[in-house]
Design a protein with these regions (language model features):
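Oxidoreductase cofactor-interface core, primarily capturing Rossmann-like NAD(P)-dependent enzymes
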Residues: 1-69, 73-85, 89-91, 97-104, ...
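Conserved active-site and cofactor/substrate-binding residues in soluble primary-metabolism enzymes
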Residues: 19, 51, 109, 120-123
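Histidine kinase transmitter module recognition
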Residues: 34, 117-120
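Short, hydrophobic/aliphatic alpha-helical segments
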Residues: 105-108, 130
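Short helix/strand-capping connector loops at secondary-structure junctions
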Residues: 107-116
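Amphipathic terminal alpha-helices
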Residues: 113, 121-137
């Protein structure tokens, strides 16, 4: 959640190998159009580098030309704030384990799924930040 030039999320110092929606779509498209080749396989596409939220905020700041800070917060307070902002309570509950995974660093191991399945290197976070910079201004 972006609030007053801050990314506020209960992630602590956990790292994540953030993956772009384009890369997820590329993997999905290949597996759906070549089902025999991918039958019985499971993929967990990742980006090429694991980053903490603080490092991600630094990269977004550089691309956007303004400071975007990361602020860790208490998970339960964050969920309550999301619900009070209009997020359905049922969906907010789904965020509890997702943010716990982020905080634990369980998603911090980049893999080759995007490259191996789609044939192209995954989008870097710097590329993502540059592409989405207008949204952060």
């Amino acid at each position: 959640m972006l609030f007053r030039s801050e990314i506020v999320v209960p992630a602590g110092d956990g790292a994540e190998a953030f993956v772009s929606v384009e890369d997820i779509a590329a993997v999905a498209a290949v597996t759906l159009t070549e089902p025999e080749k991918h039958a019985g396989r499971a993929y967990a596409p990742t980006g090429p580098q694991a980053l903490t939220m603080a490092k991600a905020a630094e990269m977004i700041s550089a691309a956007a030309g303004r400071t975007i800070a990361y602020r860790d917060t208490d998970r339960e307070e964050w969920i309550a704030a999301m619900v009070s902002s209009g997020l359905p309570a049922e969906y907010a509950q789904v965020l509890r384990p997702l943010t716990a995974t982020l905080a634990s660093g369980n998603g911090a191991r980049p893999n080759r799924d995007v490259l191996d399945v789609s044939g192209k290197a995954p989008v870097t976070f710097v590329e993502f930040a540059a592409k989405t910079a207008p949204a952060w201004k």
